[in-house]
Amino acid sequence: MTELQQDVEDTKPAKVLGKRESKLGSAHSEAENGVEEKKKACRSPTAQSPTPSVEADSPDQKKIISLWSKSSFDGASLASDKNDCKTESKNDPKTERKKSSSSSQYKANMHFHKLFLSVPTEEPLKQSFTCALQKEILYQGKLFVSENWICFHSKVFGKDTKISIPAFSVTLIKKTKTALLVPNALIIATVTDRYIFVSLLSRDSTYKLLKSVCGHLENTSVGNSPNPSSAENSFRADRPSSLPLDFNDEFSDLDGVVQQRRQDMEGYSSSGSQTPESENSRDFHATESQTVLNVSKGEAKPTRADAHVNRVPEGKAKSLPVQGLSETVGILHKVKSQKCPMLHHILIFYAIVVCALIISTFYMRYRINTLEEQLGLLTSIVDTHNTEQAAPSGLRSQVQFNVEVLCQELTANIVKLEKIQNNLQKLLENGD
C-alpha cells in the first residue's frame, strides 16, 4: 500500500508538470492568435490584456503573465505602426507634387537662362507658356516671362528662333483672334516690332501676367492715353502761350480728332491681314488731317492779329468746338459723296461691257453652229451625188468652187472670232 501511494504521489507532480507545459503551449498559441486579431481589429491592448491574479505563486504562472503582456505590447506597437503608415501615405502625394513642381520650375529656369544669355541669372523665371509665333509660317515654341524680360524660343526645321523683348520697351499688349473666330492670340508691340503669339491654351492668365510685368502700360489705356504722344508734345511746345481762347479750343478739337484717327489706325493695324483699301483709307485720313490743320492755321492767323481788340464771349468760345467738329464731319461727307458716284459710274460701265461681251460670244457661237450645219449638208449632198451617179465635170467644178468659197468664209470668220476673243480677254484683264 505504501508503495502504491508513493507511485501515485510521484505521478501527480508529473501530471502537474504536463498540465503546466500544455498551458504554456496553449498560452503561446493564444498569444500569437491575439496578436493577429489585434492587427486585424486594431483593438486596444487594455481590452485584450488579461487581469493577472494577484495570487500568482508559481514561477510558471509568472512566465505566462509576462508572455501575455509581451503579446499585448506587440499588438499595440503594430497598430501604432499601421496608423503612422496611413498618415505617411496620405502626406506623400502632396510632398511629391511639391517636389515635382519645384523641380520642373528649377529645370525651366535653368533652360531659360541657358537659352537667353542676355537675361541676368539673378532674375528668376516667373512662368512659361507653350504658344506659336505667327509669321510666314507658325513657329511653335515657348514664351518665357520674367520680371523684366519677355522671351520666345522656337526650333522648327532645325532653325532656332529667339526673341527677347525688354518689358519697358513694350508699347502695346492686346488680345486678338486668329481667322476672326478663335480668341487665342496676343499682340505684343514695341516701337519697332510687332509680334503675334497664337495657340495659347490659357490666354487670359498669360495676358494678366504680361500686364503685371509691363506695369507702365497700366496707367495708359490702349488708344486713349491721357498723356499725349511725342508729336503732340512737340506741337504743343512750339505753340505760343499767349493765344486767344477760341484758338486753344480749336486746337483741342484737333487733338480729339487726331486721337480718334489714331484709334482708327490702331484698329486697322490690329487686324491680321491688311488690304489695299485699308491702306488707301489710311492715306486719305492722313491727308485729311493735314488739310484740317492747314485750314485751322489759316483761320488762326487773323485771330492773332485781332486777339487784343475783340475778345470772344464764353458762350461762343464753348460753341466753337462743336462747330469745328461739324465742319470736319461735313468735309468727310462731301469727300465720300464725291467718291461714291465715281465708283458707281465705273461699276456700271464695267457691267455694260461684260454684258456686251457675253451677248457677242453667244451670237458668234450661234453663227459657227449654223455654218457647221451648212457644211454638213453640203458634204452629204456631194457624197450622195458621187455614189448615185457621176455628175458632170461642170457641176463638180461648181460644187468644188462653192466648197472652196465656204471654206474661205469659214476661215475668215474663225480669224474674226479669234480677234474678238483676244479683245475680250484684254478687256477682262483691264477690268480686274
Curated annotation (Swiss-Prot):
The modification N-acetylmethionine is found at M1. One of its GO terms (molecular function) is identical protein binding. InterPro entries: GRAM, GRAM_domain_protein_2B, PH-like_dom_sf. The modification Phosphoserine is found at S225, S242, S252. Residues 110-177 form the GRAM domain. The keyword Acetylation applies. Keywords: Acetylation, Phosphoprotein. Residues 1-61, 74-106, 220-239, 262-285 are annotated as: Disordered. It holds the Pfam family GRAM. Residues 220-233, 268-278 have a biased composition (Polar residues). GO terms for cellular component: cytoplasmic microtubule. Residues 9-39, 81-99 have a biased composition (Basic and acidic residues). This is GRAM domain-containing protein 2B.
